[in-house]
């Protein structure tokens, strides 16, 4: 089960915009944040892919979810206008946003290239 973020837990685990003007990731593991809504069909298509990715990458990657209906301030902070929108947050450097119901292979490529996380070998 992926962890859902509120405004408070986002500040604690991802970025405390009250304390920092410039981006500063608070986490110790690269993460993805899925901005979604329960009524969104494409979001429902992406959800099981994200669950699979979390299982496959284990402790090398954290995947969070943000309900855009419930967390409007957080959605506005990132200018979310279409969902699903996924924020890829590396340990160093700026986060990158991707939009739409992307295939698993595209997520895997972004995880490797943007987050610098290699897919673990499953024996």
Enumerate the predicted regions with their spans.
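N-terminal targeting signals for export/organelle localization
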Residues: 1-11, 116-123
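Thiol-based oxidoreductase modules, predominantly thioredoxin-like and allied folds used
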Residues: 4, 35, 47-54, 58-73
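A short beta-strand-turn-helix
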Residues: 5-31
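Short conserved loop adjoining the S-adenosyl-L-methionine
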Residues: 21, 72-76
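Short pre-active-site segment immediately N-terminal to redox-active cysteine/selenocysteine motifs
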Residues: 28-31, 35-39, 82
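Cys/His/Pro-rich metal-binding microdomains
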Residues: 41-44, 87
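A short glycine-leucine-enriched loop at secondary-structure breakpoints
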Residues: 77-81
């Amino acid at each position: 089960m992926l962890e859902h973020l509120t405004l408070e837990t986002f500040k604690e685990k991802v970025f405390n915009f009250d304390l920092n003007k410039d981006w500063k990731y608070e986490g110790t593991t690269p993460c993805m944040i899925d901005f979604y809504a329960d009524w969104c069909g494409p979001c429902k298509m992406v959800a099981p892919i994200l669950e699979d990715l979390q299982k496959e990458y284990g402790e090398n990657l954290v995947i969070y979810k943000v309900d855009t209906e419930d967390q409007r301030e957080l959605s506005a902070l990132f200018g979310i206008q279409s969902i699903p929108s996924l924020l890829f947050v590396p340990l160093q450097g700026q986060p990158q946003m991707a939009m739409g119901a992307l295939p698993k292979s595209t997520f895997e490529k972004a995880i490797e290239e943007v987050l610098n996380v290699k897919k673990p070998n499953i024996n």
